[in-house]
Amino acid sequence: MGSATGKDGIQGASFASKDITADSANDLPSVQVGDPFQEKLLLEATLELAATDAVRGMQDMGAAGIICSTAEMSTKGDAGMRIDLDKVPMRQKNMKAWELLLSESQERMLLVATKGREEEVNAVFAKWDLPCSVIGEVTDDGMLNFF
């Protein structure tokens, strides 16, 4: 939920770890295009949901984007996930799978809703005028699958 995925922010964590040089301007696409207002709305919505039991887990899509957030959540929850990359909301057309997986943004969160409470989660995000999309499901096989 939150902002749509774009090509900005890809490998941003790697960029942030490098020394800044005269050539760093060539790496500007690695820098995320921030949206502080969207981030504030997302913060409010996630705090509201965190106070309920409608959510099983939440993870930001900061460093390494979807690939890292799904891995972290799956590990913490001792579960797996199946993620349909075609369902990931995109700001730009024709993004490659690796771009979708590695795009980093502070205005996006991965959330696992409690089974049967999905509409409640959607209602909170609608209240805050934030997009929310189902991009996959939790599995019990311990594997991460992206297709």
Regions found by a protein language model. Give the residues of each.
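Glycine/proline-enriched, intrinsically flexible loops and inter-domain linkers
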Residues: 1-147
